[in-house]
Amino acid sequence: MDKVKALIKAHKLIIFSKTTCPYCISVKDLFKKLKVVPFVVELDLESDGSELQSAAGQISGVRTVPQVFINEKFIGGCDATTKLHSQGKLIPLLQEAGFL
């Protein structure tokens, strides 16, 4: 859990993801379209990926991926992140974090 907390603290925008997950790909594509480069942890490529996913899940309350954190706050997975964007609420969060 300490490693995940340290990663979340060190990166203003971090996504816990898996390379083959379509929802993960969608949320990464959204940030790409916004010209924002998140720090991405591909859990399926990490030797301790299962432990990292469990720890991230304890912090977020969600076990599934993707898990998106902005400024150390869990904002949700793909659906929640996409919804925030469609409501005009994602851009201000990214601006606050210094991305736009």
UniProtKB/Swiss-Prot annotation:
Keywords: Cytoplasm, Disulfide bond, Electron transport, Redox-active center, Transport. It comes from the Eukaryota. GO terms for molecular function: glutathione binding; glutathione disulfide oxidoreductase activity; glutathione transferase activity; NADP binding. Disulfide bonds join 21-24. Residues 1-100 form the Glutaredoxin domain. CDD domains: GRX_GRXh_1_2_like. Signal peptide: none annotated. Pfam families: Glutaredoxin (PF00462). It is found in: Cytoplasm. GO terms for cellular component: cytoplasm. Its main location: cytoplasm. GO terms for biological process: cell redox homeostasis; cellular response to oxidative stress; culmination involved in sorocarp development; response to oxidative stress. Belongs to the glutaredoxin family. Has a glutathione-disulfide oxidoreductase activity in the presence of NADPH and glutathione reductase. Reduces low molecular weight disulfides and proteins. Affects the culmination and cell fate decision by modulating the levels of reduced glutathione. This is Glutaredoxin. It comes from Dictyostelium discoideum.
